[in-house]
Amino acid sequence: MRSYNLIAPAKINLYLEIISDRPDGYHELAMILQSIELADKINVQSLSTDTIRVNCNHPQVPTDRSNLAYRAAALMAAKFPEALAQYGGVEITINKQIPVAAGLAGGSTNAAAVLMGIDLLWNLGLTKPELEELGATLGSDIPFCVAGGTVIATGRGEKLSPLPSLDHIYVLAKYRSLEVSTAWAYKTYRQEFGNTYLKDTENLAARAAAVHSEAIVKAILNKDTGEIAQKLHNDLERVVLPAYPQVLQLRELFATQPGVLGTMMSGSGPTVFALVESEAQAQAVKLQMRAAIPDEDLELFVTRTITHGIQVASSI
């Protein structure tokens, strides 16, 4: 049986602005997304029957249709029935390294890897834009997870404009047992700040375009790490931090550590990241955070930016 091993990187948000509601129920967003080294390992293997199977080493990850990776395989089977008949179904094995429900796009990057893996298994020859378009029907972060790198994302997150790559080091912190519902975060933001949403279509388009002129984008273009750190922004912090004191605690503690240039919550949380000066400083910050919060429930990671999305590690 043919098999592909793929690397599925996590992402963080360097910028997240909520602009308005959309008719499809999503939000109109302006974001800057960044791929990081922290990644899951995905194996996609052909089966002799036309079934889909999902295995995962993490007990909290479902293996049925509620899993985005399963739905990605089901989408490919529905879109390409002749290939399914010719090559058979797929078995997907997920080796989780990315924390679950962490605001790091773990589920989305798994789905992106499955789309790419099945494309290879079935010799479909799909382009990256075609894979991104398929992914957008499943989830807003999936197109970015296919593309990777440093990207401006608008619409609901599916419209991508690449930026020059960054060479940054981050420390990530998250409590294992703490989860923040993305749906809750956006719903609460709408309830509390919906009166600030733009209404006019022309204004929406202008605001989405204006993100290209934001100070953080200029800092990225200039590779000014200090300025990038100062311009980190996430609207969802306005509702998540007051409701989740543990997330606020991590953010405030990161801000006091020597060598931390900037800190912010990623996505809807609960992961908080700190941009630091060097690998040595990152390891020192990790130790300082562990000493300040000697709680086994706290996960800490040192990672760095990467320039790509899903990659093939090997094939059999």
Positions of PLM-derived features:
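ATP-binding N-lobe of GHMP and related small-molecule kinases
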Residues: M1-A102, L120, L124-P129, L166, ...
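Residue-level signal for inorganic ion chemistry
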Residues: L14, I42-V44, A69, G107, ...
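Short beta-strand-to-turn element immediately C-terminal to the catalytic PLP-Schiff-base lysine
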Residues: E17, Q45, C145-A147, V151-R156, ...
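Hydrophobic C-terminal alpha-helix "anchor/cap" residues
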Residues: L33, G135, F254, M289-R290
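Conserved beta-strand termini and adjacent loop/short-helix elements that scaffold enzyme active sites
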Residues: N57, N95, A147, T303-T305
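Glycine/serine-rich anion-binding loops at beta->alpha junctions
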Residues: T93-W122, S140, G259-V272, V276
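Alpha/beta catalytic cores of group-transfer enzymes, especially the acyltransferase/condensing modules
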Residues: L126-V180
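Conserved, helical-rich catalytic subdomain that frames metal- and/or nucleotide-binding sites
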Residues: E158-G262, E277-Q283, L287, D297-I316
